[in-house]
Amino acid sequence: RRCHETADYLDHLLDERPDLHGAALPYANHDELAELVMTRLWNRTRATDLQALADISSHEECDFWIALAILLRVFPDPQSDPALIALATHLVDRINAGTWRMRYSETPIVSPRGVELYSKLSEGRPELSLSEETMSRALAHAAWLARGQKTATRFAMFNGAPIWAANNLEID
């Protein structure tokens, strides 16, 4: 298997050498953690995957959006393995305590829709629900980021084409 990026390498280590994954993880940056969380097919019953997600949530580059992405990946049924429920509850407690800052993140759930999706999933599960304060802050932050993305240069249009595409055209 060919590893082109750090997230690929971490994914490979998790499958082939889980003993080395913990040693390599501290060298990953925020974007690489986000990519790993979003692209890996996580196994909710595999102890090494649960430990890796716990390690990612303890990483200094982890933020609110990566933690929310982890929660969406591992959201437990009431009959789930106690280790899975413990991980999810721990993440919710840390999110509600304001442990992780809200900043720009590569995770696609950085949107009001992603926050609302988690809110719907956690209905009737108070131990897994985000506090009202956290929800309102997350919705406001996601809306602010969405507004910024619409006006960012990379999303601006000129003659029906994105400006970044026009800037990359080769002109003779």
Q: At which residue positions do the language-model features occur?
A:
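Alpha-helical scaffold segments
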Residues: 1-172
